[in-house]
Amino acid sequence: MDKLKIAEWGEKLKTGGAQMSRMVSEKVKDMLQAPTLESKMVDEATLETLEEPNWGMNMRICAQINNDEFNGTEIVRAIKRKISGKSPVSQRLSLELLEACAMNCEKVFSEVASEKVLDEMVWLIKNGEADSENRKRAFQLIRAWGQSQDLTYLPVFHQTYMSLEGENGLHARGEENSMPGQSSLESLMQRPVPVPPPGSYPVPNQEQALGDDDGLDYNFGNLSIKDKKEQIEITRNSLELLSSMLNTEGKPNHTEDDLTVSLMEKCKQSQPLIQMIIESTTDDEGVLFEALHLNDELQQVLSSYKKPDETEKKASIVEQESSGSKDTGPKPTEQEEQEPVKKTGADDDKKHSEASGSSNKTVKEEKQAVKIELGLSSDEDEK
Protein backbone atom coordinates (compact mmCIF):
# COMPACT_ATOMS: atom_id res chain seq x y z
CA MET A 1 0.00 0.00 0.00
CA ASP A 2 2.79 2.38 0.83
CA LYS A 3 4.37 1.86 -2.57
CA LEU A 4 1.05 2.50 -4.33
CA LYS A 5 0.55 5.74 -2.40
CA ILE A 6 4.04 6.87 -3.26
CA ALA A 7 3.37 6.10 -6.92
CA GLU A 8 0.10 8.08 -6.81
CA TRP A 9 1.84 11.03 -5.22
CA GLY A 10 4.50 10.86 -7.92
CA GLU A 11 1.86 11.00 -10.65
CA LYS A 12 0.21 13.99 -8.98
CA LEU A 13 3.53 15.78 -8.85
CA LYS A 14 4.10 15.09 -12.55
CA THR A 15 0.68 16.35 -13.64
CA GLY A 16 -1.10 18.65 -11.21
CA GLY A 17 2.07 19.94 -9.54
CA ALA A 18 4.03 20.72 -12.69
CA GLN A 19 3.03 24.35 -12.66
CA MET A 20 3.81 24.71 -8.97
CA SER A 21 7.24 23.17 -9.54
CA ARG A 22 8.00 25.70 -12.25
CA MET A 23 6.94 28.54 -9.98
CA VAL A 24 9.11 27.27 -7.16
CA SER A 25 12.11 26.81 -9.44
CA GLU A 26 11.71 30.33 -10.81
CA LYS A 27 11.51 31.81 -7.32
CA VAL A 28 14.58 29.87 -6.19
CA LYS A 29 16.43 31.08 -9.26
CA ASP A 30 15.44 34.66 -8.49
CA MET A 31 16.62 34.29 -4.90
CA LEU A 32 20.02 32.97 -5.99
CA GLN A 33 20.45 35.59 -8.70
CA ALA A 34 22.48 38.67 -7.78
CA PRO A 35 20.41 41.87 -7.51
CA THR A 36 20.55 44.09 -10.56
CA LEU A 37 20.28 47.85 -10.81
CA GLU A 38 16.75 47.43 -12.15
CA SER A 39 15.68 45.28 -9.20
CA LYS A 40 17.17 47.79 -6.77
CA MET A 41 15.17 50.60 -8.36
CA VAL A 42 11.98 48.55 -8.17
CA ASP A 43 12.72 47.75 -4.53
CA GLU A 44 13.14 51.44 -3.80
CA ALA A 45 9.90 52.33 -5.60
CA THR A 46 7.92 49.65 -3.69
CA LEU A 47 9.22 50.09 -0.16
CA GLU A 48 6.82 49.01 2.56
CA THR A 49 7.40 52.31 4.36
CA LEU A 50 5.80 54.27 1.50
CA GLU A 51 2.20 55.26 2.07
CA GLU A 52 1.61 56.35 -1.53
CA PRO A 53 3.33 55.61 -4.84
CA ASN A 54 6.48 57.61 -5.49
CA TRP A 55 5.44 59.01 -8.86
CA GLY A 56 8.74 60.75 -9.37
CA MET A 57 10.58 57.45 -9.01
CA ASN A 58 8.04 55.65 -11.21
CA MET A 59 8.37 58.21 -14.01
CA ARG A 60 12.15 58.10 -13.72
CA ILE A 61 12.08 54.34 -14.22
CA CYS A 62 9.87 54.80 -17.30
CA ALA A 63 12.25 57.39 -18.73
CA GLN A 64 15.25 55.13 -18.24
CA ILE A 65 13.44 52.24 -19.93
CA ASN A 66 12.64 54.43 -22.94
CA ASN A 67 16.25 55.64 -23.09
CA ASP A 68 17.53 52.03 -22.98
CA GLU A 69 19.33 52.77 -19.73
CA PHE A 70 17.26 50.07 -18.01
CA ASN A 71 16.37 46.62 -19.28
CA GLY A 72 12.59 46.47 -19.52
CA THR A 73 12.61 42.70 -19.01
CA GLU A 74 14.46 43.02 -15.70
CA ILE A 75 12.06 45.72 -14.52
CA VAL A 76 9.04 43.55 -15.31
CA ARG A 77 10.60 40.54 -13.60
CA ALA A 78 11.29 42.58 -10.48
CA ILE A 79 7.70 43.84 -10.46
CA LYS A 80 6.45 40.28 -10.89
CA ARG A 81 8.41 39.18 -7.81
CA LYS A 82 6.87 42.00 -5.79
CA ILE A 83 3.34 41.06 -6.89
CA SER A 84 3.91 37.46 -5.83
CA GLY A 85 5.23 38.58 -2.44
CA LYS A 86 3.33 38.68 0.83
CA SER A 87 3.47 42.42 1.57
CA PRO A 88 0.17 44.15 0.67
CA VAL A 89 1.91 47.52 0.48
CA SER A 90 4.56 46.26 -1.95
CA GLN A 91 1.88 44.53 -4.02
CA ARG A 92 -0.15 47.74 -4.32
CA LEU A 93 2.88 49.86 -5.21
CA SER A 94 4.03 47.22 -7.72
CA LEU A 95 0.68 47.32 -9.51
CA GLU A 96 0.88 51.12 -9.74
CA LEU A 97 4.44 50.92 -11.07
CA LEU A 98 3.42 48.25 -13.57
CA GLU A 99 0.59 50.43 -14.87
CA ALA A 100 2.89 53.46 -15.16
CA CYS A 101 5.46 51.48 -17.15
CA ALA A 102 2.80 49.97 -19.40
CA MET A 103 1.27 53.38 -20.15
CA ASN A 104 4.55 55.15 -20.90
CA CYS A 105 6.78 52.43 -22.39
CA GLU A 106 5.86 50.73 -25.67
CA LYS A 107 7.72 47.46 -25.13
CA VAL A 108 6.48 46.75 -21.60
CA PHE A 109 3.24 45.08 -22.71
CA SER A 110 5.23 42.49 -24.64
CA GLU A 111 7.41 41.88 -21.59
CA VAL A 112 4.33 41.52 -19.37
CA ALA A 113 2.96 38.89 -21.74
CA SER A 114 6.23 36.98 -22.16
CA GLU A 115 7.16 37.01 -18.46
CA LYS A 116 3.70 35.69 -17.47
CA VAL A 117 2.98 38.58 -15.13
CA LEU A 118 -0.72 38.04 -15.79
CA ASP A 119 -0.49 34.63 -14.10
CA GLU A 120 0.71 36.28 -10.90
CA MET A 121 -2.06 38.86 -11.12
CA VAL A 122 -4.67 36.13 -11.60
CA TRP A 123 -3.22 34.29 -8.61
CA LEU A 124 -3.53 37.49 -6.58
CA ILE A 125 -7.16 37.97 -7.66
CA LYS A 126 -8.13 34.41 -6.75
CA ASN A 127 -6.30 34.47 -3.42
CA GLY A 128 -9.00 35.00 -0.81
CA GLU A 129 -6.43 35.87 1.85
CA ALA A 130 -4.89 38.71 -0.18
CA ASP A 131 -5.75 42.36 0.36
CA SER A 132 -9.15 43.12 -1.16
CA GLU A 133 -8.06 46.46 -2.61
CA ASN A 134 -5.07 44.86 -4.31
CA ARG A 135 -7.30 42.14 -5.77
CA LYS A 136 -9.64 44.79 -7.17
CA ARG A 137 -6.76 46.80 -8.55
CA ALA A 138 -5.29 43.77 -10.32
CA PHE A 139 -8.69 42.96 -11.81
CA GLN A 140 -9.09 46.56 -13.01
CA LEU A 141 -5.80 46.40 -14.89
CA ILE A 142 -6.56 43.03 -16.49
CA ARG A 143 -10.02 44.22 -17.49
CA ALA A 144 -8.68 47.46 -19.02
CA TRP A 145 -5.96 45.62 -20.92
CA GLY A 146 -8.34 42.86 -22.01
CA GLN A 147 -10.86 45.35 -23.41
CA SER A 148 -8.27 47.56 -25.13
CA GLN A 149 -8.32 47.44 -28.93
CA ASP A 150 -4.66 48.48 -29.00
CA LEU A 151 -3.58 45.16 -27.48
CA THR A 152 -5.29 42.81 -29.91
CA TYR A 153 -1.86 41.81 -31.24
CA LEU A 154 -1.27 40.18 -27.82
CA PRO A 155 -4.24 37.79 -27.39
CA VAL A 156 -3.13 36.72 -23.90
CA PHE A 157 -4.59 39.90 -22.38
CA HIS A 158 -8.07 39.34 -23.82
CA GLN A 159 -7.96 35.62 -23.08
CA THR A 160 -6.98 36.20 -19.46
CA TYR A 161 -9.75 38.74 -18.99
CA MET A 162 -12.39 36.50 -20.58
CA SER A 163 -11.21 33.60 -18.42
CA LEU A 164 -11.68 35.66 -15.26
CA GLU A 165 -15.00 36.99 -16.50
CA GLY A 166 -16.26 33.48 -17.14
CA GLU A 167 -15.02 32.01 -13.86
CA ASN A 168 -16.11 34.83 -11.61
CA GLY A 169 -18.78 36.92 -13.32
CA LEU A 170 -20.40 37.82 -10.02
CA HIS A 171 -17.15 39.32 -8.79
CA ALA A 172 -16.81 41.42 -11.93
CA ARG A 173 -20.40 42.73 -11.74
CA GLY A 174 -20.09 43.39 -8.03
CA GLU A 175 -16.96 45.46 -8.56
CA GLU A 176 -18.53 47.46 -11.38
CA ASN A 177 -21.43 48.33 -9.10
CA SER A 178 -19.14 49.35 -6.26
CA MET A 179 -16.70 51.47 -8.26
CA PRO A 180 -18.94 54.52 -9.05
CA GLY A 181 -19.31 55.28 -5.36
CA GLN A 182 -15.58 55.45 -4.79
CA SER A 183 -13.53 58.59 -5.25
CA SER A 184 -9.77 58.43 -5.64
CA LEU A 185 -7.12 60.99 -6.41
CA GLU A 186 -6.47 59.35 -9.78
CA SER A 187 -10.12 59.69 -10.85
CA LEU A 188 -10.16 63.31 -9.68
CA MET A 189 -7.14 64.09 -11.82
CA GLN A 190 -8.96 62.79 -14.89
CA ARG A 191 -12.14 64.84 -14.40
CA PRO A 192 -10.98 68.19 -15.84
CA VAL A 193 -9.99 66.59 -19.15
CA PRO A 194 -12.70 65.11 -21.42
CA VAL A 195 -10.25 62.59 -22.92
CA PRO A 196 -7.66 60.33 -21.32
CA PRO A 197 -4.01 61.46 -21.46
CA PRO A 198 -2.01 60.53 -24.59
CA GLY A 199 -0.53 57.07 -24.61
CA SER A 200 -2.98 55.64 -22.09
CA TYR A 201 -5.35 52.78 -22.72
CA PRO A 202 -9.12 53.18 -22.31
CA VAL A 203 -10.37 52.59 -18.78
CA PRO A 204 -14.18 52.22 -18.56
CA ASN A 205 -14.31 53.43 -14.98
CA GLN A 206 -12.68 56.74 -15.86
CA GLU A 207 -15.03 57.30 -18.78
CA GLN A 208 -18.00 56.59 -16.55
CA ALA A 209 -16.70 59.03 -13.96
CA LEU A 210 -16.32 61.66 -16.66
CA GLY A 211 -19.90 61.18 -17.73
CA ASP A 212 -21.37 61.27 -14.25
CA ASP A 213 -19.52 64.34 -12.92
CA ASP A 214 -20.01 67.82 -14.32
CA GLY A 215 -17.11 69.60 -12.63
CA LEU A 216 -14.42 69.64 -10.03
CA ASP A 217 -16.68 70.67 -7.17
CA TYR A 218 -18.43 67.32 -6.83
CA ASN A 219 -16.32 65.71 -4.11
CA PHE A 220 -13.13 67.74 -4.20
CA GLY A 221 -14.19 70.22 -1.55
CA ASN A 222 -14.68 67.36 0.91
CA LEU A 223 -11.08 66.15 0.68
CA SER A 224 -9.24 66.00 3.96
CA ILE A 225 -5.99 67.80 4.65
CA LYS A 226 -4.16 64.49 4.21
CA ASP A 227 -5.65 63.98 0.75
CA LYS A 228 -4.75 67.53 -0.25
CA LYS A 229 -1.17 67.00 0.90
CA GLU A 230 -1.01 63.79 -1.14
CA GLN A 231 -2.28 65.61 -4.22
CA ILE A 232 0.31 68.36 -3.72
CA GLU A 233 3.06 65.76 -3.33
CA ILE A 234 2.02 63.89 -6.49
CA THR A 235 1.94 67.11 -8.50
CA ARG A 236 5.28 68.22 -7.11
CA ASN A 237 6.94 64.93 -8.08
CA SER A 238 5.64 65.21 -11.65
CA LEU A 239 6.70 68.85 -11.84
CA GLU A 240 10.22 68.16 -10.57
CA LEU A 241 10.71 65.34 -13.07
CA LEU A 242 9.37 67.50 -15.90
CA SER A 243 11.64 70.39 -14.92
CA SER A 244 14.68 68.13 -14.85
CA MET A 245 13.85 66.80 -18.33
CA LEU A 246 13.27 70.28 -19.77
CA ASN A 247 16.59 71.49 -18.35
CA THR A 248 18.58 68.47 -19.56
CA GLU A 249 21.49 69.49 -21.79
CA GLY A 250 22.03 67.86 -25.15
CA LYS A 251 18.34 67.38 -25.88
CA PRO A 252 17.20 70.26 -28.12
CA ASN A 253 14.02 68.40 -29.11
CA HIS A 254 12.97 67.50 -25.60
CA THR A 255 9.55 69.09 -26.15
CA GLU A 256 8.74 66.33 -28.66
CA ASP A 257 9.55 63.47 -26.29
CA ASP A 258 6.55 61.27 -25.46
CA LEU A 259 7.33 61.15 -21.76
CA THR A 260 7.76 64.92 -21.63
CA VAL A 261 4.41 65.44 -23.35
CA SER A 262 2.75 62.99 -20.94
CA LEU A 263 4.21 64.76 -17.90
CA MET A 264 3.18 68.13 -19.30
CA GLU A 265 -0.40 66.91 -19.73
CA LYS A 266 -0.40 65.62 -16.16
CA CYS A 267 0.84 68.98 -14.87
CA LYS A 268 -1.84 70.78 -16.87
CA GLN A 269 -4.47 68.50 -15.36
CA SER A 270 -3.11 69.08 -11.88
CA GLN A 271 -3.07 72.86 -12.10
CA PRO A 272 -6.87 73.36 -11.68
CA LEU A 273 -6.80 70.88 -8.78
CA ILE A 274 -4.10 72.90 -7.03
CA GLN A 275 -6.14 76.04 -7.61
CA MET A 276 -9.17 74.33 -6.05
CA ILE A 277 -7.04 73.41 -3.04
CA ILE A 278 -6.07 77.08 -2.70
CA GLU A 279 -9.70 78.18 -2.83
CA SER A 280 -11.03 75.50 -0.47
CA THR A 281 -8.27 75.53 2.17
CA THR A 282 -9.02 77.89 5.05
CA ASP A 283 -7.97 75.92 8.14
CA ASP A 284 -4.34 75.02 7.35
CA GLU A 285 -1.88 77.76 6.44
CA GLY A 286 0.90 75.26 5.70
CA VAL A 287 -1.11 73.46 3.01
CA LEU A 288 -2.26 76.80 1.59
CA PHE A 289 1.32 78.08 1.37
CA GLU A 290 2.53 74.89 -0.33
CA ALA A 291 -0.34 75.03 -2.82
CA LEU A 292 0.35 78.69 -3.65
CA HIS A 293 4.06 78.05 -4.15
CA LEU A 294 3.38 74.96 -6.28
CA ASN A 295 0.88 76.87 -8.42
CA ASP A 296 3.52 79.53 -9.16
CA GLU A 297 6.02 76.83 -10.14
CA LEU A 298 3.44 75.17 -12.40
CA GLN A 299 2.75 78.43 -14.22
CA GLN A 300 6.47 79.07 -14.67
CA VAL A 301 7.19 75.62 -16.11
CA LEU A 302 4.12 75.65 -18.36
CA SER A 303 5.10 79.05 -19.76
CA SER A 304 8.72 77.98 -20.33
CA TYR A 305 7.46 74.87 -22.15
CA LYS A 306 5.64 77.05 -24.68
CA LYS A 307 8.60 79.37 -25.37
CA PRO A 308 10.57 77.01 -27.68
CA ASP A 309 7.57 76.56 -29.99
CA GLU A 310 6.90 80.32 -30.09
CA THR A 311 10.57 81.06 -30.82
CA GLU A 312 10.59 78.58 -33.71
CA LYS A 313 7.44 80.14 -35.17
CA LYS A 314 8.90 83.66 -34.97
CA ALA A 315 12.15 82.49 -36.58
CA SER A 316 10.25 80.89 -39.46
CA ILE A 317 8.19 84.08 -39.99
CA VAL A 318 11.33 86.25 -40.06
CA GLU A 319 12.99 83.87 -42.52
CA GLN A 320 9.97 83.96 -44.81
CA GLU A 321 9.87 87.76 -44.72
CA SER A 322 13.60 88.07 -45.48
CA SER A 323 13.37 85.64 -48.38
CA GLY A 324 10.32 87.47 -49.70
CA SER A 325 12.11 90.86 -49.61
CA LYS A 326 14.94 89.49 -51.74
CA ASP A 327 12.54 88.43 -54.49
CA THR A 328 10.51 91.69 -54.56
CA GLY A 329 12.92 93.58 -56.95
CA PRO A 330 11.77 94.28 -60.59
CA LYS A 331 12.57 91.51 -63.00
CA PRO A 332 14.14 92.43 -66.42
CA THR A 333 11.94 91.99 -69.46
CA GLU A 334 12.71 89.53 -72.22
CA GLN A 335 13.85 92.33 -74.56
CA GLU A 336 16.20 93.73 -71.92
CA GLU A 337 17.65 90.29 -71.37
CA GLN A 338 18.37 89.89 -75.12
CA GLU A 339 19.94 93.37 -75.65
CA PRO A 340 23.08 92.66 -73.57
CA VAL A 341 23.59 89.53 -75.62
CA LYS A 342 23.48 91.45 -78.90
CA LYS A 343 25.73 94.16 -77.58
CA THR A 344 28.22 91.62 -76.41
CA GLY A 345 28.27 90.00 -79.86
CA ALA A 346 28.95 93.33 -81.59
CA ASP A 347 31.78 94.11 -79.26
CA ASP A 348 33.32 90.74 -79.95
CA ASP A 349 33.23 91.31 -83.73
CA LYS A 350 34.84 94.74 -83.37
CA LYS A 351 37.60 93.37 -81.23
CA HIS A 352 38.21 90.56 -83.71
CA SER A 353 38.55 92.98 -86.68
CA GLU A 354 40.91 95.23 -84.77
CA ALA A 355 43.01 92.27 -83.83
CA SER A 356 43.21 91.05 -87.44
CA GLY A 357 44.14 94.55 -88.70
CA SER A 358 46.88 94.96 -86.20
CA SER A 359 48.24 91.54 -87.07
CA ASN A 360 48.41 92.41 -90.82
CA LYS A 361 50.16 95.69 -90.05
CA THR A 362 52.75 93.89 -88.01
CA VAL A 363 53.56 91.46 -90.88
CA LYS A 364 54.16 94.33 -93.34
CA GLU A 365 56.50 96.10 -90.97
CA GLU A 366 58.55 92.95 -90.54
CA LYS A 367 58.91 92.50 -94.34
CA GLN A 368 60.06 96.09 -94.76
CA ALA A 369 62.71 95.69 -92.08
CA VAL A 370 64.06 92.55 -93.80
CA LYS A 371 64.40 94.37 -97.12
CA ILE A 372 66.34 97.21 -95.57
CA GLU A 373 68.75 94.77 -93.98
CA LEU A 374 69.36 93.02 -97.35
CA GLY A 375 70.00 96.37 -99.12
CA LEU A 376 67.20 95.98 -101.54
CA SER A 377 65.94 99.20 -103.08
CA SER A 378 62.47 100.21 -103.36
CA ASP A 379 62.73 100.00 -107.17
CA GLU A 380 63.73 96.39 -107.11
CA ASP A 381 60.94 95.79 -104.76
CA GLU A 382 58.58 97.38 -107.20
CA LYS A 383 59.97 95.16 -110.05
UniProtKB/Swiss-Prot annotation:
Basic and acidic residues biased stretches: 306-316, 339-354
Q: Please provide the record's keywords in A-Z order.
A: Cytoplasm, Membrane, Phosphoprotein, Protein transport, Transport
UniProt GO BP: protein transport to vacuole involved in ubiquitin-dependent protein catabolic process via the multivesicular body sorting pathway
Q: How does it sit in the membrane?
A: Peripheral membrane protein
Q: Name one GO molecular function term.
A: phosphatidylinositol binding
Localization annotation: Cytoplasm; Membrane
- Expressed in which tissues: Ubiquitously expressed.
Q: Where is each GAT domain found?
A: 223-310
Q: What Pfam family does this protein match (any one)?
A: VHS
For this UniProt entry, what is the primary localization, expressed as one broad class?
cytoplasm
Q: Which domain of life is it from?
A: Eukaryota
Q: Per the record's keyword annotation, is Membrane included, yes or no?
A: yes
Q: Which residues carry this modification: Phosphoserine?
A: S377, S378
Output the Gene Ontology cellular-component terms: cytoplasm; membrane
Region entry Disordered, spans: 305-383
Please state which protein family the record places this protein in: Belongs to the TOM1 family.
| PANTHER family membership | TOM1-LIKE PROTEIN 1, TOM1-LIKE PROTEIN 2
Q: Quote the function comment for this protein.
A: Binds ubiquitin in vitro. Might contribute to the loading of the ESCRT machinery.
Name of the protein in question: TOM1-like protein 2
Organism from which the protein derives:
Arabidopsis thaliana
